[in-house]
């Protein structure tokens, strides 16, 4: 399968299964919900930036390690407290930071990061994280060298920062 006339480089990123498609469906529902979250069985999906308040938090809190003070963190933590069955987290953009912070804040829950897309982390070297994914030209996650980078031929920054393109290729053969 080709995407924008290029064969994507998708080594070891969960293709060949419906992993990314399930995450897309959950994140779509989180973005559509009032509280920016959606639960499916034991997985909490958390929407990323979607309004001016989130943009404010992106600029004034995330770069300074103050994710716990972000509005999205408070929303997700409330849902987490009300749902003790949640064991896995999926996030996109802002909510990647929120997911990671929730995991750290609740060690007793043994929360697992199922997937994070377009994470705004700064990691210039070191080990790749199994469940962090980014597109090659994503401007938000360009300093996250700890994620698995996929080249889908997306050059538009808005498209490259999305999470839904992974699901289009969920049954592609790895190269």
Model-flagged regions — what are they?
Residues 90-95, 99:
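Gly/Ala-rich beta-loop-alpha elbow adjacent to hydrolase catalytic centers
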Residues 1-88, 107-175:
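Alpha/beta hydrolase fold serine-hydrolase catalytic domain that processes acyl esters and thioesters
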């Amino acid at each position: 399968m080709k995407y924008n006339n290029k064969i994507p480089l998708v080594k070891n990123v969960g293709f060949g299964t419906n992993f990314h498609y399930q995450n897309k469906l959950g994140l779509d529902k989180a973005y559509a919900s009032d509280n920016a979250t959606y639960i499916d069985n034991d997985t909490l999906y958390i929407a990323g930036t979607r309004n001016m308040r989130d943009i404010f938090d992106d600029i004034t809190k995330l770069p300074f390690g103050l994710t716990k003070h972000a509005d999205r963190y408070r929303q997700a933590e409330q849902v987490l407290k009300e749902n003790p069955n949640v064991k896995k987290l999926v996030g996109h953009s802002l909510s990647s930071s929120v997911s990671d912070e929730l995991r750290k804040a609740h060690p007793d829950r043994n929360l697992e990061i199922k997937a994070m897309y377009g994470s705004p982390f700064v990691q210039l070297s070191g080990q790749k994280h199994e469940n962090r994914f980014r597109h090659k030209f994503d401007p938000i996650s360009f300093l996250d060298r700890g994620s698995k980078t996929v080249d889908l031929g997306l050059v538009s920054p808005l498209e490259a920062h999305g999470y839904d393109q992974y699901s289009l290729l969920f049954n592609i053969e790895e190269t």
